[in-house]
């Protein structure tokens, strides 16, 4: 038996260490938490996608009594961006979350389904998406979705 190891590299940043544009995208993700419909979980997630053309598309989680019918903030933002601007790659995606007590201290990461969707989008445009995961204690900065999903399932897996 052979043991192998996978490491994920990311930076822990403070808001003021980001570029002005990245700070704006993070602030938009925080703003997007206010549009979440989280009647059941009271967990409000916001996402903001900066497109190559400079437009920011925001999304938030939208819950449903039938939980599998709910949508996460990341997919809401990404699908809205792709439906509205199908030829524009996403350059940066920021994610923030809060409860009824306020913005979380530590960042949250996308669920598995969102990671898979983000990976597909990254591959579609052959351009990495910088991921900024916001928490009051700091921001996890990742250079690519691949950093969130080291064992990924992509189109090439379905070919001989």
Locate each region found by the language model.
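Short, compositionally biased leader-like segments
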Residues: 1-27, 101-103
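Short Pro/Gly-enriched beta-strand edge/turn motifs at strand-loop
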Residues: 27-34
């Amino acid at each position: 038996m052979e043991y192998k190891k996978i490491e994920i590299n990311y930076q822990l940043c403070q808001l003021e260490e980001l570029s002005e544009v990245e700070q704006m995208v993070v602030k938009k993700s925080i703003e997007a938490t206010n549009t979440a419909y989280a009647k059941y979980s009271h967990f409000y997630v916001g996402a903001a996608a900066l497109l190559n053309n400079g437009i920011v598309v925001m999304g938030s989680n939208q819950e449903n009594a039938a939980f599998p019918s709910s949508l996460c903030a990341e997919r809401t933002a990404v699908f809205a961006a792709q439906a509205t601007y199908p030829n524009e790659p996403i350059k940066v995606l920021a994610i923030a979350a809060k409860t009824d007590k306020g913005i979380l201290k530590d960042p949250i990461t996308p669920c598995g389904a969102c990671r898979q969707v983000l990976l597909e989008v990254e591959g579609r445009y052959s351009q990495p998406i910088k991921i900024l995961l916001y928490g009051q204690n700091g921001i996890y900065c990742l250079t690519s979705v691949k950093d969130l999903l080291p064992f990924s399932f992509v189109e090439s897996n379905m070919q001989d």
